[in-house]
A protein has these predicted regions:
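Primarily NTPase-proximal linker/entry elements flanking Walker-type ATP/GTP-binding cores
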Residues: 10, 14-131, 136-181
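Conserved catalytic-core segment of NTP-binding enzymes
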Residues: 160-174, 188-292, 297
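Generic hydrophobic-segment detector
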Residues: 5, 38, 90-93, 157, ...
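Short glycine-rich anion-binding loops that position phosphate/pyrophosphate groups of nucleotides
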Residues: 184-186
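Short beta-strand segments
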Residues: 99-100, 182, 216, 270
Length: 300
């Protein structure tokens, strides 16, 4: 558990530093003045906390400081209450299809996800259905070899749906625990590419109804992430999110908006380049990591 919290802390360090420094500045003040509230509002919105939750937090922060409930605790309580009705991650299905726009770290996430399940003792197959990029197929092949995972790739086929069908079919025949399918990055405004993705999902669904569709979202994209997910969901039923590049952003609050506005659970956060830098998402660890310093979060 401590390892999970530390990984989450690492991924949210930039966001946490800004918020923690601000709350430290407020320490000792019984009441925050208008300039304090304005600075807090700017910081929360800059972290992509979202306007609705920011308003709720500001309302709580305007109340006089109480020794029995610190401002930090009230901050956490606001987020917990705000997210009390959102779906939480469940056990993922056998087949996991990863989708997303270009540059979100999707192919790397496929490999990391494979490593995660393999480390848990599960048999895993990677399916290289990003047929538009030879480099992506080679990247998956290298990862599969390095992690000792099964692989389905077809250098001669340009039809991603065909590769996906073969990969999932082979994995089911071999009774593997997980089959993780990579797809090419696509602009969510391109109807033709999105319909192709729809076809990939359709052919996989003919083989099994145990399919999860996770969208990889670059945490740095902020509000654009919401629009990306909405567009993808028009063509394919998204069941969850992998937030990538969390270690490089000060906008870690975007996870809150994704969960609340899209009602999609966040399953993993990418917090680095190594294969084990894909962290299972824990709402409790996430909320603690937004504001508390490392020793407090680990010991709290």
């Amino acid at each position: 558990m401590i390892s999970l919290i530390k990984k989450t802390l690492s991924g949210l360090s930039k966001t946490r530093t800004k918020l923690s420094n601000l709350f430290a500045k407020f320490s000792g003040k019984s009441i925050l003045d208008d300039s304090d509230i304005e600075e807090l509002e700017e910081t929360l919105l800059g972290a992509d906390i979202g306007w609705e939750l920011t308003e709720s937090i500001l309302e709580k922060m305007r109340e006089p400081d109480k020794k029995e409930v610190s401002r930090e605790e009230r901050f956490q309580q606001c987020i917990q209450q705000y997210l009390s009705d959102v779906d939480q991650p469940r056990d993922l299905h056998k087949v996991i299809l990863l989708v997303g726009i270009n540059g979100t770290g999707k192919t790397t996430s496929v490999a990391k996800l494979g490593g995660y399940f393999s480390n848990a003792g599960e048999s895993v197959s990677l399916v290289a259905a990003d047929t538009y990029r030879a480099a992506a197929v080679e990247q998956i092949r290298i990862w599969a070899t390095r992690l000792n995972l099964h692989l389905t790739a077809n250098d001669k086929s340009a039809d991603p749906a065909s590769v996906a069908f073969d990969g999932v079919s082979n994995g089911i025949t071999k009774n593997l625990d997980r089959i993780i399918v990579d797809t090419s990055g696509r602009v969510h405004t391109s109807a033709n590419l999105m319909k192709e993705l729809e076809k990939i999902y359709r052919v996989i669904s003919k083989l099994t109804d145990e399919v999860d569709v996770l969208i990889t979202i670059d945490a740095n994209t902020g509000q654009n992430a919401l629009q990306q997910a909405r567009e993808f969901s028009q063509y394919i039923p998204l069941t969850g999110v992998i937030l990538t590049k969390m270690d490089g952003t000060a906008r870690g609050g975007i996870a809150i908006q994704i969960m609340k506005e899209l009602n999609l659970p966040v399953y993993f956060m990418g917090v680095g380049e190594q294969v084990d830098d894909l962290v299972p998402f824990s709402l409790d660890s996430y909320i603690k990591s937004l504001i508390l310093m490392e020793t407090e979060a680990v010991n709290g």
